[in-house]
Swiss-Prot record:
A divalent metal cation binds at residues 121, 126, 162, 165. It catalyses: 3-hydroxyanthranilate + O2 = (2Z,4Z)-2-amino-3-carboxymuconate 6-semialdehyde. It holds the Pfam family 3-HAO. The keyword Iron applies. It comes from Pyricularia oryzae (strain 70-15 / ATCC MYA-4617 / FGSC 8958). It is an enzyme of class 1 (oxidoreductase). This is 3-hydroxyanthranilate 3,4-dioxygenase.
Length: 184
């Protein structure tokens, strides 16, 4: 049986307490497509890589999508009312700021597909794009698996140490290290 439509403003009024760090997401639908409502702020430094595209719609405020595009690190600002389709296999780190809300749509992962969470060395003197740690898994529950990966990286310093320069990678962005486009 089909469920009723979701009224986003009403849902947020009644359920915004469900958007908890470090990911701040809640899966509204989780069938052939996963539809997540995502609030800010979040606190993560990983770059997620999945084999299927992701669709972003920014309902309130602006977000920053940090990506690695053909080996180049760059930031894409998705403003209130904007939508953006991220191709599969693109390393990305969604940065959400306080009092912002977006909707993200992802395909159910095909059998045998592998998601990855990758952390890069943040030391400017190290090799650009140096991977500190990468976790791989078949994603069946976006609501819990990404959060578990972030928590694992946070609590295990051995995962955070760069094998090339020895720098300890941050598990969350340092305060003030990312400029909020909502305040520009």
């Amino acid at each position: 049986m089909l469920g009723p439509p979701v009224n986003l403003p009403k849902w947020l009024e009644e359920n915004s307490h469900l958007l908890k760090p470090p990911i701040n997401n809640y899966c509204v639908y989780n069938d052939d497509f996963t539809v997540m409502i995502v609030g800010g702020p979040n606190a993560r430094t990983d770059y997620h890589i999945n084999q299927t595209p992701e669709w972003f719609y920014q309902y309130k405020g602006a977000m920053m999508l940090k990506v690695v595009d053909d080996g180049v690190f760059r930031d894409i600002i998705i403003r209130e009312g904007d939508m953006f389709l991220l191709p599969g296999n693109t390393p990305h780190n969604p940065v959400r700021f306080a009092d912002t809300v977006g909707v993200v749509l992802e395909q159910r992962r095909p059998e045998g597909s592998i998601d990855r969470m990758r952390w890069y060395c943040q030391n400017p003197d190290c090799t650009p794009g140096q991977v500190v740690h990468e976790a791989s898994f078949h994603c069946t529950d976006l609501g819990t698996q990404i959060k578990a990966g972030v928590e694992s990286f946070k609590t295990d310093e051995s995962l955070r140490k760069c094998g090339k320069c020895g720098e300890l990678a941050d598990w969350c962005p340092k305060p003030g290290s990312i400029l909020d486009p909502n305040k520009a």
